[in-house]
């Protein structure tokens, strides 16, 4: 929080204020690691839901207080400010409600507990307050905001309802404090007292792994389940908006995006998530999915391009979602992380930095380490494949030949990493596997070798497919350049436009032709010495041969 205050005091730019707001919200997340969520059954979902709950409440209540305090500064723009806050509050309401449902499901054993325990009664009171606040927000959006647009003098009615909402929110926060200090119906004793193995992974220890169980086992991670559902839903809403407007959007982009969302759900809530902390080989399956399979599918969906086409640009100089996305894609930071060398080093170097440092064991033993691992590999994979096959707007990408060379080098490094894991004799994260105690050291080494083979083999398929996509994009780029050249030549009666000619010939041939032209011009300049005209021969004295030569 102190960092957020420091950033806001140091800069007055819109980007700086946005960074300060993001840092302030991130500072709330450590609070979710305390309270009922710490060390209990379903620890991961409890911590995630509490973190989302805190962020949603802060944005909702804090945003409303900010609108009330700054309403005089808005002047004639108050209707627009309130309308935009209403949209933000709607999303915060959904986040608070959904995270509250998840958290309550972990604390309530049966529906009867809602009316027979003090915890359940407080939960019902909080739910009633949430519904009342939702109704007030609906009134804001349907009645007061249109009234403010028609008549800006109706500010008093808005302030009256807004202050009333703040009072009700304060009551809800008081109930939340009482709820956090009440004993829930489901005992929140540390699960280490019940099942030591379950205490290590945070949920009931699974049965021995089989291929069928890898496909059918489910342990929902509600955070990534909600993220994937929101990504798929918002994408389809944007596509529908484009089509209703008469614009086309290819199914070749929609299908990969939806497949990527589905694969993200499977990697974080299916078999790879259930057995990811139990065996090295199953952990490697989850890792490869998060790093090598989900990101290229999401990149092919072109989400930034879709967003820019679906959302209108603001005309008043303020920043909405579209403006923030544009600012981010063209920022200095974006140019750095999408640099081909940087993206490749982060992508490939993360393998070594993760598995050959304490980070690997930290990701197995702690929830925050696992979350950092998941987010990091998703982002690093997305940036790497964005440089290779992305079509979204952003910093200038390298030529296609450089992309292929970069991909081949990364593929070679990936194969070397897999072979190193397969042939290694040191057990990685050995303390964690010994705590589980379900395999001997010989079995651990064999399983680790299998994981290295998975890293080598599973990583080759997406690399080959991406290489084919790069070649296809390269061929399409050449064909489009040739088509532009032919059209321009036809318009100019088959004359060759120099610029299009250079584009069709390619950069290397264009540079060679330019150099040859410069040499010819210099040579022509050296020969351009004034020479006196040859005297006309005298027809009377000239010999026949001279006469014929002169003619």
Residues covered by each model-derived region:
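Alpha-helical membrane segments of multi-pass proteins
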Residues: 1-551
């Amino acid at each position: 929080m102190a960092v957020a205050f420091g950033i806001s005091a140091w800069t007055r730019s819109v980007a700086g204020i946005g960074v300060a707001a993001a840092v302030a919200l991130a500072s709330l997340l450590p609070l979710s690691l305390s309270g009922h969520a710490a060390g209990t059954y379903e620890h991961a979902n409890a911590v995630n839901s509490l973190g989302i709950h805190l962020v949603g409440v802060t944005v909702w209540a804090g945003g409303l207080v900010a609108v009330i305090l700054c309403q005089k500064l808005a002047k004639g723009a108050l209707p627009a400010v309130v309308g935009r806050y209403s949209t933000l509050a709607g999303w915060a309401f959904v986040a608070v409600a959904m995270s509250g449902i998840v958290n309550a499901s972990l604390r309530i054993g049966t529906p009867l507990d809602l009316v027979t325990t003090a915890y359940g009664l407080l939960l019902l009171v909080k739910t009633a307050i949430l519904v009342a606040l939702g109704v007030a927000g609906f009134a804001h959006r349907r009645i007061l905001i249109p009234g403010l647009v028609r008549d800006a003098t109706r500010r008093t009615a808005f302030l009256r309802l807004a202050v009333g909402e703040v009072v009700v929110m304060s009551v809800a926060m008081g109930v939340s404090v009482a709820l956090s200090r009440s004993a829930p119906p489901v005992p929140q004793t540390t699960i280490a007292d019940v099942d030591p193995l379950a205490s290590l992974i945070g949920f009931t220890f699974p049965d021995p792994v089989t291929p069928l169980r890898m496909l059918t086992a489910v342990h929902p991670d509600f955070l990534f389940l909600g993220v994937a559902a929101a990504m798929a839903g918002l994408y389809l809403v944007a596509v529908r908006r484009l089509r209703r407007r008469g614009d086309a959007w290819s199914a070749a982009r929609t299908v990969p995006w939806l497949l990527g969302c589905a694969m993200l759900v499977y990697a974080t809530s299916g078999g790879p998530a259930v057995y990811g902390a139990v065996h090295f080989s199953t952990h490697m399956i989850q890792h490869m999915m998060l790093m090598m399979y989900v990101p290229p599918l999401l990149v092919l969906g072109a989400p930034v391009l879709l967003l820019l086409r679906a959302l209108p640009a603001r005309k008043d100089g303020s920043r909405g979602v579209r403006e923030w996305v544009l600012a981010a894609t063209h920022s200095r930071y974006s140019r750095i992380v999408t640099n081909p060398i940087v993206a490749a080093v982060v992508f490939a170097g993360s393998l070594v930095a993760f598995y050959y440092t304490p980070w690997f064991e930290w990701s197995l033993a702690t929830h925050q380490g696992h979350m950092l691992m998941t987010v990091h590999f998703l982002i690093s994979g997305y940036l790497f494949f964005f440089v290779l096959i992305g079509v979204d707007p952003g910093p200038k990408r390298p030529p296609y030949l450089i992309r292929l060379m970069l991909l081949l080098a990364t593929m070679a490094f990936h194969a070397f990493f897999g072979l190193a894991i397969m042939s290694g004799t040191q057990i990685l994260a050995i303390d964690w596997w010994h705590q589980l105690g379900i395999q001997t050291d010989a079995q651990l080494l064999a399983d680790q070798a299998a994981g290295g083979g998975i890293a080598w083999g599973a990583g080759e398929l997406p690399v080959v497919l991406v290489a084919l996509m790069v070649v296809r994009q390269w061929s399409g780029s050449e064909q489009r350049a040739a088509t532009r050249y032919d059209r321009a030549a036809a318009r100019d009666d088959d004359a060759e436009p120099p610029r299009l000619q250079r584009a069709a010939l390619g950069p290397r041939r264009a540079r060679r032709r330019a150099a040859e032209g410069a040499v010819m011009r210099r040579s022509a300049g050296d020969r351009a010495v004034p020479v006196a005209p040859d005297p006309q021969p005298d027809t009377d004295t000239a010999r026949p041969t001279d006469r014929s030569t002169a003619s």
